[in-house]
């Protein structure tokens, strides 16, 4: 398992090609290694956005994450192959099972059960493994079925800070141990990623919890501040916390959303 840190930034939305490319340049200037774009209706299509970004950055280029249920495996593999070639092999493909019923309805697609969506994600993943074996795959989630799939087939495990409703004393450690058991001998080859959802943007050291609260609306501020995807304190304090995550959990790949890019850049500087 890698010991070197990597940092990803999730970005989306720009009024024009020039505005998008300027956002990408700024992100690279903050020290990020990977540009990650989402896959949601209403946001720019991920592959054209990544191809445009490739013109102005040396960062690796990824999705966080493609809704696998939107794609037929052979057509997706064709697009991934073309994108990887046109970006000189910089693609990292993040995959998920999809969760927003309204997006399936807008796309005029049936909304399968969670189990059926994960089963289809497995079908897509195995096809890509066979036909595009050199493109790294991330699978993100928290439940047992999707984490088992990730442990067996992914290169990168996208952790969400623990399992919703978990009663474990340390939900993040519990999920990592689950992946370790499911992965067996290949666990040492896996890279662990977590998305940091809250970062202080001023000298107070107190983060804006609005993004975190969107995913955990029933928790109090005190409970939100205790979550592993929330950082507090100075850039040096946060850097020390990420070192602890590496040493205690084996997590070396950290991602933030674009609104936190500049603030998190100061943390990256502490770790480089």
Positions of PLM-derived features:
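Active-site-adjacent structural elements that line small-molecule/cofactor binding pockets in enzymes
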Residues: 1-272
């Amino acid at each position: 398992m890698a010991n070197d840190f990597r940092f990803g930034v999730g970005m989306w939305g720009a009024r024009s090609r020039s505005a998008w490319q300027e956002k990408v340049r700024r992100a690279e200037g903050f020290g990020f290694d990977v540009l990650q774009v989402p896959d949601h209706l209403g946001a720019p299509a991920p592959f054209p956005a990544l191809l445009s970004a490739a013109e102005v950055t040396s960062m690796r280029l990824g999705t966080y994450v493609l809704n696998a249920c939107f794609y037929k495996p052979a057509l997706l593999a064709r697009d991934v192959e073309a994108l990887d070639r046109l970006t000189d092999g910089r693609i990292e493909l993040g995959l998920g099972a999809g969760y927003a019923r309204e997006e399936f309805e807008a796309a005029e697609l049936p909304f399968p059960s969670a189990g059926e969506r994960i089963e289809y994600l497995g079908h897509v993943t195995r096809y890509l493994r066979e036909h595009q074996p050199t493109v790294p795959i991330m699978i993100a989630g928290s439940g047992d079925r999707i984490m088992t799939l990730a442990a067996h087939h992914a290169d990168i495990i996208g952790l969400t800070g623990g399992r919703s409703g978990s009663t474990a004393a340390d939900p993040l450690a519990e999920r990592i141990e689950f992946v370790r058991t499911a992965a067996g001998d290949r666990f040492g080859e896996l890279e662990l990623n977590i998305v940091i959802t809250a970062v202080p943007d001023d000298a107070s050291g107190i983060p804006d919890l609005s993004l975190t609260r969107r995913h955990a609306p029933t928790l109090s501020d005190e409970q939100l501040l205790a979550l592993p995807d929330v950082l507090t304190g100075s850039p040096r304090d946060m850097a020390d916390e990420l070192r602890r995550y590496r040493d205690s959990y084996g997590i070396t790949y950290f991602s933030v959303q674009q609104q936190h890019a500049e603030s998190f850049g100061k943390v990256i500087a502490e770790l480089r």
